[in-house]
Amino acid sequence: MNSYLLLLMVSLLTCIGQLCQKQAAQCWEQPQARRLNLTLRWLAIAVVSLGLGMLLWLRLLQQLPLSVAYPMLSFNFVLVTLAAQLFYGEKATLRHWLGVAAIMFGILLMSWHL
């Protein structure tokens, strides 16, 4: 499988796992009767997503050196920032977006190495 596609899949699964963990944390605001059931559902989805991401990560490490693959995983910062704004209405400051832009520039530089 193409290394870039594999990296994108790892990033997406990791992002999904993070969003599910956030959702599980927010379930504690629910009435106590529903809290545990909802939390466990979101945590189960998070574990599955993160577990699949880890398996694909191991496959990716067979194709790329760790010194190249790991910095490119920083794409997660971009995905999680965008998802947090979209799904949770979280606001990012200009400084945050400049940091995201710097990360994207770094990923671009790393991808030329491949």
UniProtKB/Swiss-Prot annotation:
The keyword Lipid metabolism applies. GO terms for biological process: lipid A biosynthetic process; lipopolysaccharide biosynthetic process; transmembrane transport. The keyword Cell membrane applies. Residues 43-112 form the EamA domain. Pfam families: EamA (PF00892). One of its GO terms (molecular function) is transmembrane transporter activity. Translocates 4-amino-4-deoxy-L-arabinose-phosphoundecaprenol (alpha-L-Ara4N-phosphoundecaprenol) from the cytoplasmic to the periplasmic side of the inner membrane. PANTHER family: 4-AMINO-4-DEOXY-L-ARABINOSE-PHOSPHOUNDECAPRENOL FLIPPASE SUBUNIT ARNE-RELATED, SMR FAMILY PROTON-DEPENDENT DRUG EFFLUX TRANSPORTER SUGE. This is Probable 4-amino-4-deoxy-L-arabinose-phosphoundecaprenol flippase subunit ArnE. It comes from Yersinia pestis. The gene is arnE.
